[in-house]
Structures are given as C-alpha cells and as structure tokens.
C-alpha cells in the first residue's frame, strides 16, 4: 500500500501510548480486574494496528490479519471497561471523579478530547479510506492529539 511509512506507524503509536498510560492510571485508581482486561484488550488492538503499519512501512508486506481485529478488539475492550464501571458503580467516589474532571486545566483537556474524538468519528465516517495514506495521517494526527489530551486531563485531575 503506497504511502504507508515507518513515520506513519510511529505517529500511530502516539495515541496507543497516551491511551495506554491513561488507562494504567485509571486502572490503578479503579482497581477492577475487568477494567484492566478491557484496557489491555483496547491497547493490544492499537498495538496490532501499529505493528501492521510498521511492517507495511519497513517490508511493504500487508499482513491484514494484524489490522482486521482492531475494531472488534477495541470495541470488546471498551465494553469491558464500561461494564466494570456499572459493576463497581457503588465503589467509585463519583464526587472525586467529577471534581477531577471539572478542575482546571483538566476540564479543558477533557473537552478537547471529546471534541477531537467526535471529529475523528465524523472524519472516519465521511472522509476516511483505510488504504489512503493521507487519510491515515490525518486520522492519526487527530487521534494523537486527542489521546494526549485525555492523558493530560487525567494527569492534571
């Protein structure tokens, strides 16, 4: 696939790393094994996609089996994380969560994260083609900034 470079794979690794660190921080506070499994599954999905792009960039081999599980693995991971919050609802100090989310500057980072993820959803639905390197660059830059905003929001909370 033309235009899939090592640089694109490395940029794709930024949101995976930012999201992974953010999930480790949340998992440490939540302490739910279900959340940890969901977070690990979501991060593993991202790592598979980064590996796919790295192999494309270095050896020009399209190992689609590394890319195909991304959406189902990520969705399953997000579902497990959501279920962990429902199951542990009474154990979570929601006042502290709300206070952290609404604190400055965390609130700005969380608003930016939500806005960027919304924009990414729109972009993927209306403009994105998986085989288009330019579209992948755009999506990865949006995602890298967005997931870094999530991480910064959590760090400042």
Feature names for model-found ranges:
Residues 1-41, 50-157:
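Polytopic alpha-helical membrane-helix bundles and their juxtamembrane interface segments
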